[in-house]
């Protein structure tokens, strides 16, 4: 545990076989600790009002900014020094990363942004309050959409007021642009970037910070820790929470 109380920081440790062996040159070599920290963004305006944000570019609340600053100070307190950082292209994650890096005096490190670290796309649920969605769908169906690993929400259509396809950040995605995602689809969208951009940096000995979103981090934890599909529903990452240090498989 890196901290307790309001920060509710969850520490998750994993044994690294593949990465440790490659770093040391053999499968039987002793494993070196390889660090990566997963940081969920601070509270957003739609977290506070309990609306489905998905890919809508919602900013942080004052509380969220404070959570991000506290996360950075906590990282500094525990001696985390990063070589690079990664974040989604959504401002709640971007601002959280900026703030945490500033608070830990690491604002100068290289940062990479990618849509693949965006929050799960909630499709037609996007923008609805949890209360309105429950009234429309019923409590049981809404729970399936939210927590069922392979259950896709109804897709977002072009007449949706928050239609993702109109955003220039995503114009070149073509068929890769999601209209709504199950947790499984979110998992499958995140992993290519994980293996192409993050894992090679860790293999190269770099210390990495990733600022992302609740469902993205849940999917990564599932992948790293082998969490069963049905058990993933019980994992929740608080806003402003760091998961780390991780030694990665």
Residue ranges and their predicted role:
Residues 35-39, 86, 112, 206-220, ...:
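Beta-strand elements within well-structured catalytic alpha/beta cores of enzymes
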Residues 54, 150, 170-187:
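Surface-exposed cleft-lining segments at the edges of enzyme active sites
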Residues 61, 65, 86, 90, ...:
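Amphipathic, non-transmembrane alpha-helical scaffold segments
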Residues 44-57:
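Glycine-rich N-terminal loop/short-helix segment of MobA-like nucleotidyltransferase
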Residues 54-72:
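Short catalytic helix/loop segments, enriched in acidic residues and glycine
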Residues 182-214:
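GST-like fold's C-terminal all-alpha helical module
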Residues 4-6, 10-33, 69-164, 169-171, ...:
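Phosphate-coordination/substrate-recognition cap region in phosphate-metabolizing enzymes
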């Amino acid at each position: 545990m890196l901290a307790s109380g309001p920060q509710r920081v969850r520490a998750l440790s994993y044994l690294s076989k593949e990465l440790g062996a490659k770093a040391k040159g053999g499968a039987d070599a002793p494993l070196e600790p390889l660090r990566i920290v997963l940081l969920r963004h601070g509270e957003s305006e739609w977290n506070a009002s309990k609306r489905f944000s998905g890919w809508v570019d919602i900013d942080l609340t004052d509380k969220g900014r404070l959570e991000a600053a506290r996360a950075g100070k906590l990282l500094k307190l525990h001696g985390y020094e990063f070589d690079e950082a990664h974040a989604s292209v959504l401002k709640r994650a971007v601002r959280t990363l900026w703030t945490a890096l500033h608070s830990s005096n690491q604002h100068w490190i290289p940062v990479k942004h990618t849509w693949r670290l965006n929050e799960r796309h909630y499709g037609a649920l996007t923008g609805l309050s949890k209360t309105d969605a429950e009234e429309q769908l019923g409590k049981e169906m809404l729970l399936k959409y939210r927590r069922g690993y392979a259950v896709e929400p109804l897709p977002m259509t072009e007449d949706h007021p928050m239609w993702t396809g109109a955003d220039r950040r995503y114009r070149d995605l073509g068929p890769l642009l999601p209209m709504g995602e199950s947790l499984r689809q979110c998992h499958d969208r995140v992993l290519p970037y994980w293996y192409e951009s993050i894992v090679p940096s860790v293999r190269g000995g770099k210390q990495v910070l990733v600022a992302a979103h609740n469902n993205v981090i849940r999917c990564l934890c599932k992948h790293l820790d082998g969490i069963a599909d049905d058990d993933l529903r019980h994992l929740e990452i608080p806003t402003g929470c760091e998961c780390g240090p991780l030694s990665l498989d």
